[in-house]
Amino acid sequence: MGKFPKDFLWGGATAANQCEGAYKEGGRGLSSVDVVPFGPDRFPVALGQLKMLDCDAEHFYPSHEAIDMYHHFKEDIKLFAEMGFRCYRLSIAWTRILPNGDDAQPNEEGLRFYEELFDECHKYGIEPLVTLCHFDTPIALIKKYGGWKDRRMVDAYAHYCEVLFQRFRGKVKYWLTFNEINMLLHMPFMGAGLLFAPGENVQQVKYQAAHHELVASAKAVKLAHAIMPDAMVGCMLAAGQFYPRTCAPADVQAAAEADRDNYFFIDVQSRGEYPVWAKKRIERAGIALQMEPGDEQLLKEGTVDFISFSYYSSRCTTVDPELMNKASGNAIMDAVKNPYLKASDWGWAIDPVGLRITMNSLYDRYQKPLFIVENGLGAVDKVEADGSIHDTYRIDYLRAHIEQMEKAINEDGLPLLGYTTWGPIDLVSASTGEMKKRYGFIYVDKDNEGKGTLARSRKDSFYWYKKVIASDGEDLA
């Protein structure tokens, strides 16, 4: 194996709503994920089909305690440092800073919490990479405005960003505006706090909300650069190349269109304007986007510095409606099973070469540095009698993907800033709400029903990843 650059940012990634817990502590307000329950109602709520804006006694809400990192962050960051992390991607909970989403004055207790967390990272030489909004629209703003369908969300978000940039300049260099921004179209409540009234034009609402998030992202980039001249601000895409199921031209065209659709948001964030095909699509659908004077100029001026993305699997598509389903590779996006690939316990296609293909696709399209900010294997881990966890399957998955990253850097010449695996510590799954779908190098004693001691322990992959980082990616054995 060739080596990675000496300044390569190895690390791991989490999200506040999947790990922090303490959902009512420290002055924190309620956010969208807090009302997304575990069980059969989870997807209807996440998709905006079932309205739930408060918690009830009938449901279990995994995010309320999560893995209680709010009270364990020093212990957890020390474990990250033991692995040799150079970077830790985390998100700030909007409602921990502004409990109602648009409060004139921020919650000092929330600011102090993140200040302590960043100081703990710097103590070990770990660079924070901060996601400003990771599936956590403030409930107060959903009730007040209907979430991102309303233009006033842009100013609320810009105010939130300015509070953070002013407070944490000098402590945080790398920022992401929205996590997996393209998920707005697939999980509209999780992604943008959207609910749909009977008879409402769903596509109109989604694309209007998308425009508001894109304008907000551009505002955040401009604010960050004005307040912190050395800051680097990225977009974040749920990525994964679409393959045609066959070489029939119709399937090839379907795959090309699926890729193009997936790139819609970051086309705008990276190039500063709506692509022509998107304008045509919106026009054909009869969608009348409300744009304010100056929006187009703002999008041009607020382009991102780098492209970050999550990659778990590639996807396969076809024009044959009988082959399409929603259970092969991703429960959210339509896909068809790829007969050439094995799948994870949750049906996600395992395709390391697809990562290299995706990286080349993104760089060819945007010519901006890349950053892989999520990649990992969700699996059921068995704890042995002596407490050990032999997760060789996770090591195999990550090794194969790191090998393809090395090829992309050294053979294809791609500029890759870093790699933060998803879930360096077990946390609540965003899609299913499960704990048994584990990604971590660190095991957390907690089950799907919320029972457990929350004790942390090292898996075999912990020691493996430590060795990978220490060798700059050269020793993957």
Sequence positions of predicted segments:
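Active-site region of glycoside hydrolase catalytic domains
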Residues: 1-57, 81, 100-102, 111-477
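Catalytic domains of carbohydrate-active enzymes, especially glycoside hydrolases
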Residues: 68, 72-93, 301-306
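Glycine-rich, proline-tolerant flexible connector loops at the mouths of alpha/beta enzymes
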Residues: 92-106
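Active-site mouth loops of central-metabolism enzymes
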Residues: 58-72, 149-152
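A short acidic, glycine/proline-enriched capping/turn motif at secondary-structure boundaries
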Residues: 86, 95-97, 135-137
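Short, flexible active-site loop motifs that bind/organize anionic cofactors or intermediates
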Residues: 63, 70, 101-104, 345
